[in-house]
């Protein structure tokens, strides 16, 4: 027994020894087997433009985690690359992860098991299955892992840290974010390198680009880089919130935020295609708040300017994102982004001036993203002066020849590659693209030139030739444009350069609020904004808007180079020590070196400084104003320069320089610019720009005083006026040959119409012989139709718009122009009474009995809308009626609606007699020919006794109406000082208004109880209510309103169809005459006698309704009308035609049976034989077009219910 047991123990030892030897051999083989062949280069992660740079990986070998124990050592095969324990981020569970290489039957993958024992069981089961498959035995069941992640399907992998774990490996799959927690940093690095390498290789293999990188041609390298699959080193999964750009551009949702060396890429979940790419140069600022990270991008991005807010896991991740973004931005352009992170926005003025100047005048200097202006090489440099408020700007552009040495500020950086030179925003006002000569009235004194040069040196960021090695390298590490401070050195407006804004900084416009680091560039409201900061060796306090801080201004002493401490009270460069000396000692001493060295340089002739407002003790205003110069009249350059030189000589040099055309009000700090005529004077220079300044010009105070066309509140009352405008006030000018340039603004044949203010502000200048305007420079005469452009205003006819000219017809064509030049007496005394509409010429009749006059200029369309508002003091300028004006009217397209305030005496009701008719309201419906209706009332007949036949004879299509012996007298009445022979109403309709329906489409009915006339249109189920209530003429002309009655409160219940009919009826309230004292007793008898007479049908008008308004016994008239028409009183009373459809049909049948053509000659014969005593029968039936629906109504409930029609309710007054 003992021997057997001993032999068994010996065998077991031998088996264990052999197993251990085999295991050690396998592990040695795995440890010495590389993942890639030794001749193959390792994978480059980050090639191409979309990858984060070059990260070379050393040859990785298989290794084991420190957590693996010896008992876990077993042969696992060559496919296992790395294995070990890691924790899951979500719950912190410890799992056993295994990274496997790609094999013939499986891709590269990451697996994890519950623990190492499970992994060993799976390995043994896999080995047993392989043996069974080889021997043909039964294959045992395999133990699958908990999860398998295919690496080529992963988006990327990244190292991460959050509030809970410091060593995270974040693996981004197609649809999720999977993070693992390592024990230490080395473990994290090892897993990250292997995962990133295997992911990239798997992607390359899938894309067919796996292999050695091509050598030789750059094109081959570029093609290989373009074929590289996207792989990003720094990736975060964020949730873009619907705020800012996320809301406007619909970018909200889950994204992968990928950061590279030059751009930020947003990739949506479940895709690898970039949704948005933002250049790092376009990022204005970035930051984080709690668990939110935000980016503010500029307008050069594809999504426009705005903010992107993203939610991440926690605040630590947001902070890490912020820091990494800043690191990338600093690495890309340290100087630029240091300035941007502190002050990311450019002031409005500087940015606008940059765009204007660079686009119009710097064609060789292209704009780069965000509006930054890039300057190239040594081919040219720009010398800028940007001085705010009381300082002018000078731009001197000088080309440097190849033999000429570069300027001092360019030295020390010429060896830099162009791509690494920082970009600068150059604010170039357009007014500086001219060379200014010294004023002939004042030659700069010798002590002024070094003073100006010292001020130039204080604003520039350059060193002298002696300080090139010492200070040139410090102060000019970037491409900084010198900021020359010519003039008074206004402390708050000077800026830029090494002294006031840090080493190597350059200011936008007039400098900016500078900090110790030289990065404060926005400058508050001013046109400032430092776009480049150096190493921050400058000291500046940043006072106010755009200022260079206390003591940063110029104003150097002539000889010693010590500044005045400019500050906010700096003066005109004459040692006004008003600023804070304590803060500017260092700056003055720093500027002194430039003062002494710059005096030896050759400079362009400096312009004389502007008036010194700070020297008087006043605080310099900045207010954030900037100046824009737009096109001015070049023809007045010499004249204005001579005038300003003369003014400068008389003022003793207070305003020095021809370019100084205006000054600002020192007591006003209004940031708003009034855009009204006559406020800012054009510059007296050769520039193409006109100043739109916020303040009046002190040099031309008399020329541009407060405009007479504004009321007490400062509003401009602009509408066309009859009276000519006043000439533009101007200052005395020197007599020269260019005097004619001013007169062309006042030509009567101008292309503009004077838009004058309201009542009380019209100058009393006499009109010219043509009655036209005397100025064209105040407002444009927009696009008037042809009849108006031949008016007294002297325009040509080439438009289709209707001017709203008060109380005045503007004529109907060029043939009318002679009638307007009858002199001042006729123009100002008689109102216009000409009827502008007539019958069609093919019918052979006109609006008046004079039908033999041929029409003139039929194409001219005297369409007008004339009215005078209440309280207007300008009298109309009418003309006497002429036959030419009556005949010239062809086809019309507009409604002639006149509102004229009548100046008359309110007479007693007993002595007034029959007053003038106030018209009828009609609203045209769309017809087959025209959508407009021409209606004009008030053209008198030469006979005091007006015949109704003559009245209705003007209606096209109404010639066949039997009007035998019909005369309605309209006796004249004295109204004020104007006596007219007769009063009447004349309705002239558009010939194009051919009805689209039959005459029987509408019926008219009179309600005896309410005294109203209803015109019913059965097709539209709409009726027009014409009120005949007496009114007073003293009231202003009313406005007739078509309205739909919301609630119908009739006397009896209505059926469903009747309710619908009643609910859609529109009431037209035409306010009638003063009183209805006249009676026509024989009206009912005359109407009832000819029973066989057909029902009177007047197409397209309510003229008879107007005539009915003159009769007080309208009830009797309509009683006879109903008897003749066969309509019972029950159906006609109380608006029965609206409620009863049968009565309406009777009206239609009667009208349908009438033959207009057959009765045409009969009506004419009756008219010839008719006597003058019998009054005409009032009309029994008329029809009107249904009111036109407004297609542009936005509110179907409200807009369709309110239809307004303006009518003419006034009488034309004449002196026979």
Swiss-Prot record:
GO cellular component terms, A-Z: plasma membrane
Region of interest (GRB2-binding), residue spans: 868-870
Name assigned to this protein: Insulin receptor substrate 4
Lineage per the UniProt record: Eukaryota, Metazoa, Chordata, Craniata, Vertebrata
Annotated gene: Irs4
Disruption phenotype: Slight defects in growth, reproduction and glucose homeostasis.
Biased composition annotated in UniProt, kind: Polar residues: 819-836
Record CDD domains: PH_IRS, PTB_IRS
Motif YXXM motif 6: where in chain: 801-804
A GO molecular-function descriptor: insulin receptor binding
Biased amino acid composition, Acidic residues: 1192-1202
Modified residues (Phosphotyrosine): 894
Motif YXXM motif 2 positions after renumbering to this chain: 672-675
GO biological process: insulin receptor signaling pathway
InterPro entries noted in UniProt: IRS, IRS_PTB, PH-like_dom_sf, PH_domain
Segments of this protein annotated with the region CRK-binding: 650-773
Basic and acidic residues bias (residue ranges): 465-477, 634-649, 736-747, 839-851
Organism the protein comes from: Mus musculus
